[in-house]
Amino acid sequence: FMRISRLFADPGYSMFKIARMADVLFVTGAVYFVVKASGKLFPKEKYSREVRWLFAALAGFMPQAIFMGTYVNTDSLALLAAAMILYAWASYLREDWTWKNCILLAVGMAVCALSYYNAYGWLLCSFFFFCFTVLLCREEAFSQRVRFLFSRGAVIAAVTLVLCGWWLIRNAGLYNGDFLGRKSCAECAEKYAQKYYRP
């Protein structure tokens, strides 16, 4: 956004406003996926429309969610990833692990991998959720469940790696193998943080 804005505006304070647009769009996308997930979690046959919207409103109007959409940081990207993954899980509950839901889960996991590493708990939970729902909740023979697990799981892993692997490889090359950037983050904190906040 900032590079595009340089074509139309002078550098300065307006650049900060424009840089925030990415975060505004990420949080808007997160609210969109939470609204979609609420439709799956609270179907209209059992729940009123107010219940579905209350769930979405509680998530979308949390002060933290609103705050994340107003400043320049990747917290909002992690929020978008969490909402996408939640929607994939909710879609599984209604439709099983269709190809569409598997791809959606993979895209959500890739977005999560591109955000903060403290959001990686969603990746771990997605792995266990997928494995447990395939192995324990399907009614076919166990050998077919295992085959289904590896065939769909391989596609999920491949799509996730294609979408986010380039970033991790780039980081490993730039930061001497530190593909998550933890060592680099600690070095910057040591260099720039105030005395009492240094690691």
Describe the role of every protein-language-model region.
Residues 132, 151-199:
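Membrane-lumen/periplasm interface segments of specific transmembrane helices
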Residues 10-13, 34-61:
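Transmembrane-helix signature of polytopic, membrane-embedded enzymes
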Residues 101-117, 123, 128, 162:
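Membrane-interface alpha helices of multi-pass inner-membrane proteins
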Residues 39-46, 85-102, 112, 134-140:
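Membrane-interface transmembrane helices that cradle and orient dolichyl/undecaprenyl
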Residues 17-44, 84:
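Transmembrane-helix motifs of polytopic, lipid-linked glycan transferases
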Residues 33-36, 77-95, 104-109, 126:
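Specific aromatic-rich, kink-prone transmembrane helix
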Residues 91-94, 122-161, 185:
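Perimembrane helix-loop-helix junctions
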Residues 64-77:
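Short acidic/glycine- and proline-prone juxtamembrane loop motifs at membrane-interface regions
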